Amino acid sequence: MVNGRLRDTSLIVDLDALRHNIQEQKKVLPENSKILAVVKANAYGNGLIPVAQTAMTSGASGLCVAILDEALELRDNGIEAMTLVLGITSVEDALIAAQAGVSLTVGSLDWLEQYHQLAQVAKPKKPLKVHLGIDSGMGRIGFTEVAAFKQAVKLLDSPEFEFEGMFTHFATADSPDENYFNQQVQRWHQFVASLAELPPYVHMANSATGLWHRETITANTIRMGISMYGQNPSGRDLKLTLDLQPVSSLVSSISFVKQLKAGRSVSYGATYTAEQDEWLATLPIGYADGYPRCMTGYKVLVDGQFCDIAGRVCMDQMMIRLPKYYPVGTPVVLMGKSGDQEITATDLAERAGTINYEILTNISNRVHRIYRQSK
């Protein structure tokens, strides 16, 4: 996809904030605990390679991605850290992972048996690193029965495998109601207790667990996802227990400004009509950039002041009402701080009827990323 370097719309990524957030989490964990930095979905929209590089120099012990292609992109850019693919990979493509030293999630005995048979023919030069997924209640992927899990562990003794880890994922760790979370913890403990010897990476904690359930962590590794990017996994349901700093800000600038006469309408559908003469500015950003079309009627920040979006958000542009004349080139903040005011990813998510995760990951590759750090 074309990257809009010649357009004044950018996602500002603060790598110092990323580093700070990792250290904030690390200092409240037991000594020798490992952090896996979750960099799937283009590092939650912030840029896979720069974020992965920063995470690995800031205390992370490894990386997590969603699909094998993301892991191979890391390898192609010289990042050789332990990298776990959290989703299911086909048995055939697992040979590629083995050669690249990429760790795969496996959630069934059948998958292991198929790879075992394939390896007898293909004879891979390296063992496949495996993390066994435990479905303790998420209902997505993983072993649900201890007996099948133990059979899988036994099969991992074969030379074509390396039993590197085991993990689960909590469905409600970001909820004030802890009942279902506690049920999942109990199921997880059953799987852990079934092994006489644990693999090097044992991880049960996601971002929410690391924030609100640290006392329950009976593992040596935590996966740091949305919290690494300075966002609250619960939205506003639970108060943050760490001093997290937002990593990304979405900014643009005024590309065109004019005085709109009373009675004139703006944008598709003519849904907004000026009641009096007013200043109107156009911004070079739209829903094709990941700024939701449903934000019509919401607000942005200009010179520390909230300004309303006028009319419908277009594919590539949008219009805003100004309190007074501002020249072309004036900065506009769509997500982030301006003066004493701020629009957060959670603010945008609430307006759009979604979660802050989706706001970040929907920012398209057409939006140029600018990375800032002090060292």
Curated annotation (Swiss-Prot):
Molecular functions (GO terms): alanine racemase activity; pyridoxal phosphate binding
Entry-linked InterPro entries: Ala_racemase, Ala_racemase/Decarboxylase_C, Ala_racemase_C, Ala_racemase_N, Ala_racemase_pyridoxalP-BS, PLP-binding_barrel
Catalytic residues as annotated in Swiss-Prot or TrEMBL: K40, Y268
N6-(pyridoxal phosphate)lysine modified-residue sites: K40
GO biological process: D-alanine biosynthetic process; peptidoglycan biosynthetic process
Keywords: Isomerase, Pyridoxal phosphate
The protein's enzyme class: isomerase
NCBIfam families given in the database record: alr (TIGR00492)
Keyword Zinc on entry: no
Sequence positions that bind substrate: R140, M315
Domain of life: Bacteria
Cofactor: pyridoxal 5'-phosphate
Name of the gene: alr
Annotated function: Catalyzes the interconversion of L-alanine and D-alanine. May also act on other amino acids.
Reactions catalysed: L-alanine = D-alanine
Protein name as annotated: Alanine racemase
GO cellular component: cytosol
Organism: Limosilactobacillus reuteri (strain DSM 20016)
Family membership noted in the UniProt record: Belongs to the alanine racemase family.
